[in-house]
Amino acid sequence: MLKNDLFLRALKRQPCSRTPIWVMRQAGRYLPEYRAVREKTDFLTLCKTPELAAEVTIQPVDLMGVDAAIIFSDILVINEAMGMNVEIIETKGIKLSPVIRSKADIDKLIVPDIDEKLGYVMDALRLTKKELDNRVPLIGFSGAAWTLFTYAVEGGGSKNYAFAKKMMYREPQMAHLLLGKISETISAYLLKQVEAGADAIQIFDSWASALSEDDYREFALPYIKQNVQAVKAKYPDIPVIVFSKDCNTILSDIADTGCDAMGLGWGIDIAKARAELKDRVALQGNLDPTVLYGTPEKIKSEAAKVLKQFGQHTESSGHVFNLGHGILPDVDPANLKLLVEFVKEESARYH
């Protein structure tokens, strides 16, 4: 039995004594303890070494007191498992090769055997689960098909997604072929993560806001829905969070995927999101990550604002406090600790 199941209870919209908190990228460069591990190895080797991945996954639980751990990995492990070469240089960016721009390129990609190609993630999950010793839940995750598609077609990050959109608009069937292949891999990967011990799943659609509403409905949401339904069909009790960054105008469409919770960027008042969705799903978020550069007073007042905007809890509401995106690498860890402690204390009044 979990000693602290607040995170899972909030996702399932069950009564909680306070609002749980974790933050995206909580295992990362802002922590000196993470940097000490990272100095010894490169980023992808860290992801692929279960002992090290488990160590950095647990650091923020020990040091910051967050209510959930998220397995240390990267969304691009799927692209690599499908046959692409992935280079991640933390300060310089990301390079994938060969780029995928034709039917022949797509045909060369495999739908991998997850245990064979991504077994190291499952090993890290099992080890982390054991070392956490039921203190807090463990989150497994994947990138969404659209985001992984953009990396495959662009060969890295992009300002305007020209190659990805060219495929969408000129050869939509080919785009769907690639998206479908990626989505099939994501679904299998998520199921294996639950099998290995993940208590909840988050799907990250980091580049969601690059698409218009209609394009998002056509090229992104159907695949997210496939992934959510794959998890729900086999593991109905495992909560799934969808983080479609800054898709604030189509919240109800995202809720229609069948997810339990929705991650919000900081560009929307959480009160508006709650009013629109009427507690159909739990909400996660949504403090601007740069608030953590602020004074202690400012951090507290901005966090208090998010809690107040979400408002009083009912029997069917759920809120997980988080940032609207990942914590930035140059934030003072003391500021995150202050935020975590403040949210734990301040949120009780709304429950």
UniProtKB/Swiss-Prot annotation:
Localization terms from the record: Cytoplasm
Keyword RNA-binding appears in the UniProt entry: no
Pathway membership, UniProt: Porphyrin-containing compound metabolism; protoporphyrin-IX biosynthesis; coproporphyrinogen-III from 5-aminolevulinate: step 4/4
Binding site for substrate: 25-29, 74, 151, 206, 325
InterPro entries on file: UROD/MetE-like_sf, Uroporphyrinogen_deCO2ase_HemE, Uroporphyrinogen_deCOase
MF terms (GO), sorted A to Z: uroporphyrinogen decarboxylase activity
Location, primary (coarse class): cytoplasm
Site entry: Transition state stabilizer: 74
Keywords, in A-Z order: Cytoplasm, Decarboxylase, Lyase, Porphyrin biosynthesis
Coiled coil spans: none
Lyase keyword on record: yes
UniProt-listed Enzyme Commission number(s): 4.1.1.37
BP GO terms, sorted: protoporphyrinogen IX biosynthetic process
Catalytic reaction annotation: uroporphyrinogen III + 4 H(+) = coproporphyrinogen III + 4 CO2
Record-level GO cellular component terms: cytosol
Family, per entry: Belongs to the uroporphyrinogen decarboxylase family.
PANTHER family linked to this entry: METHYLTETRAHYDROFOLATE:HOMOCYSTEINE METHYLTRANSFERASE RELATED, UROPORPHYRINOGEN DECARBOXYLASE
Role of this protein: Catalyzes the decarboxylation of four acetate groups of uroporphyrinogen-III to yield coproporphyrinogen-III.
Subunit structure and binding partners: Homodimer.
Protein's name according to its UniProt entry: Uroporphyrinogen decarboxylase
Source organism (scientific name): Chlorobium limicola (strain DSM 245 / NBRC 103803 / 6330)
Gene that this sequence comes from: hemE
